[in-house]
Every structure is written in C-alpha cells, then in structure tokens.
C-alpha cells in the first residue's frame, strides 16, 4: 500500500510540473481573421475598436452579440452607425429588412466582409468576385477614388492578398468609394432613404496588423470618414465574428489544449491503476 501511495505522489508531482510547464510555454501566434474588439492577435480588431472614439469624439460605443434583427428591431434613432467587420456576413431576410429600415431612418451601416451571403447580395442587386492570379503574390494594394483621400502609390499590405471585389453594381444607387490594385471596386456606398449602406470587401484593412503596417492606419481612418463625423452612437457587432473566447471552465481549458488533454488522460489512467 505504501508503494502505491509513493507512486501516486510522484505521479501527481510530475503531472503538476508538466501542467505548469505547458501553461508557461510561449503561445503560437494566432493568425485567424476575427476583427474582434478583444483580439490583440494580428488579425483581431483591438486597435480599430479602441481608436473609434478618437475618430468620432464624444460618440457612445455599444457592443452587440446577437443578430442584426434582434438588435435593431427596437431602435428608432437617427444619426447613428452600425459596424460589422467580419470575415463572412450572411444575414437572414429578417436581418436584412431590419437593417435597411434602420438605414432608411437616417443611419449608416458599414459592413466589411470577404464573403457576403448570396441572398444579401441579390437583394441589393450586386455581385462579388475573387480574382485569381497565376502569379505568386504576397502583397496587395488598395486605394480610394476621391482625389482628396487617395494616395499616389496606393496603400500596400504585405503577407495578405485582398482579391475580393464587387463585379456587378446597381449603378442607380451605388457610388464607388475604393478600389484594389486593378481598379476593381472593393468599397461602395449604397444610398437608401436618409442614410446609407457602406460595403467593403477587405475586412483585413481593419485588423491590428494592417493598421500597424506603414501608413495604413491612414487608410482605415479615411475609409471610416464616410461615416458622418457627428454620429451620436456606434453599434459594434461581435455576433458575426469568428472569436476565440477563453474557456469558461477549467475542464474546457484542458480539453482545448492537445498536450494538456493527453496529460489529463495519463493522470486519469494513473488514478485507475492506483485504485485497482
């Protein structure tokens, strides 16, 4: 019995040391595109979220974690903005209807996504496309149409190619605001009622990494300048993002980490051997 006791003590000590080592091991960089307000990784949105109050002095910030319909169906305001910066945006028909009612009242919605839902695009009579190139490119360029905002040599971003663009537009209602390196529209404005819908096809332009590269923070600020500076509130979406929230329980933390998951299995096996 004493031998078993020594075994479990030694095994437990080794297990604890292993867990401590794993917890202190440097974490690999997460390159997932989230544009989430709490994400400080390269493609998170920590910087842009915390800069919004500088770009819109005095504005009230509110974060939402539910679909557009659930958030906007009770809002009857003017002069506010709803920002959805996400890799993919595919709202339901109810979300779309509520969003456009919100815009019609005199508000602005800005959606930046690389992938838009087909039903959403069809409702607006627009289409997107992704340019394929035989060349192995490791950088992209974006710029504005307005001479007062555009750079002579465009805004450049390394390590990420931005190939999505709007291939078909409803020209009666749409204004092209920005283009990619082939002068294909990737930033447009659709007037509706007393407000407008701003669609942007390169959400990476609002990421931490993009904004810290060269003068690219200037691009982000200028893109947001199409939202009226005197707005009273900004509703920031977190629902449509890919987030990496911390585990809510110790068990989930162990199960998410492969090494700790195996350590937990070994510990359980050791306890079973001890009991037997």
Stretch-by-stretch model annotation:
Residues 1-56, 60, 72-91, 95-100, ...:
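Long alpha-helical segments found as membrane-embedded helices
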Residues 61-145:
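Membrane-embedded segments
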Residues 64, 221-254:
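Juxtamembrane amphipathic/hinge helix adjacent to a transmembrane helix
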Residues 116-117, 204-205, 241:
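Short, solvent-exposed loop/turn segments at secondary-structure junctions
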Residues 143-201:
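Catalytic beta-strand/loop cores that center a nucleophilic Ser/Cys/Thr
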Residues 199, 204-225:
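Membrane-proximal, cysteine-centered motifs at transmembrane boundaries in secretory-pathway
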């Amino acid at each position: 019995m004493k031998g078993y006791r020594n075994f479990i003590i030694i095994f437990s000590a080794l297990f604890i040391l292993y867990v401590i080592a794993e917890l202190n091991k440097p974490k690999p960089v997460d390159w997932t595109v989230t544009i989430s307000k709490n994400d400080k990784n390269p493609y998170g949105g920590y910087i842009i979220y915390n800069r919004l109050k500088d770009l819109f002095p005095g504005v009230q910030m509110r974060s939402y974690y539910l679909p557009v319909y659930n958030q906007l169906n009770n809002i009857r305001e003017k002069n506010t903005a709803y920002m959805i910066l996400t890799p993919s945006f595919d709202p339901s028909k109810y979300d779309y209807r509520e969003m456009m009612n919100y815009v019609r009242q005199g508000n602005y919605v800005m959606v930046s996504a690389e992938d838009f839902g087909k039903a959403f695009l069809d409702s607006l009579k627009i289409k997107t496309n992704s340019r394929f190139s035989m060349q192995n490119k490791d950088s992209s360029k974006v710029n504005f149409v307005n001479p007062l905002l555009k750079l002579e040599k465009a805004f450049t971003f390394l390590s990420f190619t931005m190939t999505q663009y709007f291939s078909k537009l409803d020209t009666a209602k749409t204004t092209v605001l920005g283009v990619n390196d082939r002068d294909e529209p990737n930033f447009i404005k659709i007037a509706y009622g007393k407000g407008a819908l701003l669609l942007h096809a390169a959400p990476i332009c609002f990421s931490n990494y993009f904004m810290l590269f060269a003068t690219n923070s200037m691009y982000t600020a200028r893109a947001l300048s199409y939202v009226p500076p005197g707005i009273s509130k900004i509703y920031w979406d977190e629902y449509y993002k890919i987030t990496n929230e911390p585990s809510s329980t110790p068990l989930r933390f162990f199960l998410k980490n492969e090494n700790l998951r195996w350590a937990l299995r070994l510990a359980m096996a050791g306890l079973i051997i001890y009991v037997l």
